[in-house]
């Protein structure tokens, strides 16, 4: 639901309907907070293009929609409403996270080895936050210094992928967040199918690892190895996206169509909206 609403928000933005884009992103964020990340690339591109009015309307519509959906539950059931935030603050590194991969292969006990029951992992939370801030700073540098303005889908993919890679939780369904963004950012079928295959294959050792029967289950390292391969595949996609940002002539979206960039012969950004 969140993925469909967020992607529809990008479609509305592409059709220059900023308020509708904000409403859809706000609805998506009410279902799952990650669509709020879409506003960051829009902010960067709005700054670069010098057109912040449309962005302001999108952000205002997103905030108002999110609040409109959440406020009744927030007022009637405040503890239940806040449980999502409490859970995410207190949970440790998930089995799909890079932090658990390191623990699996090295015996490292993590950033907060002496936590009591349900104590928040303060050091881990701080590390995750700092790493994501650094990623956002790098994305801002790319957005503002690339020879041609990056496409919305490219920066949005980099933002969401960075969030997943450094986050302490990567639930299996989170990979769906990347699918529409990857297709828009890097429309190369073989590359995308290779990545999707690797991601799908994580399911097999996961199930065998969780099977619970020592005679039939797999060692943890089989699972964490596939997680590492998946993360490396996502990093490769990010590298390819950055490479095409700085070499727009290699971008399939920007070559061979009307409305071309003078240097590329293709479309500037069909999802640009600015």
Regions found by a protein language model. Name each.
Residues 1-7, 31:
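Multi-pass, polyprenyl lipid-linked donor-dependent membrane glycosyltransferases
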Residues 6-20:
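Membrane-interface transmembrane helices that cradle and orient dolichyl/undecaprenyl
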Residues 19, 23-45, 68, 165-174:
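Transmembrane helices and adjacent periplasmic/lumenal helix-loop junctions
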Residues 37-64, 71, 75:
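Perimembrane helix-loop-helix junctions
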Residues 65-71, 160-168, 196-208:
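Aromatic-anchored segments of alpha-helical transmembrane domains
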Residues 73-105, 217:
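Extracytoplasmic catalytic-loop and juxtamembrane helix elements of membrane-embedded
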Residues 92-165, 242-274:
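Aromatic/glycine/proline-enriched transmembrane-helix motif characteristic
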Residues 194-274:
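Aromatic-enriched
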């Amino acid at each position: 639901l969140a993925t469909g609403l967020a992607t529809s928000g990008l479609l509305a933005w592409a059709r220059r309907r900023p308020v509708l884009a904000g409403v859809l992103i706000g609805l998506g964020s009410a279902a799952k907070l990650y669509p709020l990340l879409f506003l960051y690339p829009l902010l960067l591109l709005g700054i670069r293009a010098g057109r912040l009015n449309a962005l302001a309307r999108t952000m205002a519509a997103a905030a108002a929609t999110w609040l409109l959906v959440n406020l009744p539950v927030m007022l009637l059931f405040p503890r239940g409403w806040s449980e999502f935030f409490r859970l995410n603050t207190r949970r440790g590194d998930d089995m799909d996270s890079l932090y658990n991969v390191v623990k699996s292969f090295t015996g490292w006990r993590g950033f907060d080895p002496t936590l009591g029951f349900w104590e928040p992992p303060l050091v881990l939370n701080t590390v995750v936050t700092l790493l994501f801030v650094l990623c956002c700073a790098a994305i801002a540098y790319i957005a503002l210094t690339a020879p041609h303005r990056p496409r919305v889908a490219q920066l949005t993919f980099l933002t969401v992928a960075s969030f997943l890679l450094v986050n302490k939780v990567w639930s299996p369904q989170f990979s769906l967040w990347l699918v529409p963004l990857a297709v828009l950012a890097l429309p190369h079928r073989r590359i995308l199918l290779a990545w999707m295959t690797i991601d799908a294959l994580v399911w097999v050792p996961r199930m065998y690892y969780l099977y619970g029967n020592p005679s039939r289950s797999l060692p943890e390292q089989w699972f964490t190895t596939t997680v590492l391969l998946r993360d490396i595949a996502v990093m490769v996609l990010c590298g390819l996206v950055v490479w095409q940002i700085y070499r727009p002539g290699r971008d399939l979206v920007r070559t061979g169509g009307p409305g071309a960039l003078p240097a590329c012969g293709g479309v500037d950004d069909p999802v640009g909206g600015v």
